[in-house]
Amino acid sequence: FINDEDWGLYRWSKRNFEKERGNFGPRTYAKVCELLLRLQANYLCPAMHDASMAFHRIPENRVVADRFAILMGASHCEPLLFNTASEWKRDKMGEWDYINNKKGVDSVLNVRVKECAPFENVYTLALRGLHDRAMNASNDMGDRKDMLQEALMAQRQMLIDAIGKPGEEIPQAFTPYKEVLDVYDEGLELPDDVTIIWPDDNYGYMKRLSSPKEQKR
C-alpha cells in the first residue's frame, strides 16, 4: 500500500522521474511493480491522496501492472477501485452521499468496474465519506447498517454483471475501519467469500481478531 506519498514518491517522481507529467504514472509504477516482484510480492494498493494522480485515471497504469502480473487492490475507503479523494467531482457529480445521491455514487462505481474488469484485481467493498471520514447517514446505528448493507450488495452485483462470474469467484475485500467496525458489529452480513481485513487503531494495536465463527469463513 503506497501511503502518504505526498512527501516521498510523489515529489521524487514529479521532480526527477516524470517531469513532463508533473506527477507519477506508468513509468513510476513500472519501477514499483518491478520492486514488488523482487520482493516476491504480487499485490498493490496504489497511492490515493488527492495530491497524486489517481491510479485508474491513467489507463496505461493498469496495463503496466498487468504486464508485471501484479494484482491491484485499493484502500478501505476506495469502493470498487474508485479513488474518492481525487476522482469525485462535487461540481459535476453532486454530493458523495448514498442517501441523497445513490444513483450518482453507484453510476461512477459501475463505470470503474467495467474499466477494470479485463484485469486482475481485488475489489474493495466499502462506503465511507470523503477524505477518510464517515459517510453521511442517520444517527441510528440500525439505519447505518441497512445503508451499508444495501451499498455493498449493490457493489457486489456490479461486479457479477461486469465480470460475468459468480460473486464467490471474484476476489473481494472489506476493511471495518474506524466507524465501519461499529456498523459491522450491528449485524452487517458479508458473503463468506469476502475477505475481512482487520485494521489496527493507527497506533499499532489491533482492533479485532477473527472470532471462531469468522475463522470458518
Regions found by a protein language model. Name each.
Residues 1-99, 117, 174-175, 188-191, ...:
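Feature activates predominantly on carbohydrate-active enzymes
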Residues 49, 56, 66-67, 93-216:
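Gly/Pro-rich turn-and-neighbor structural signature
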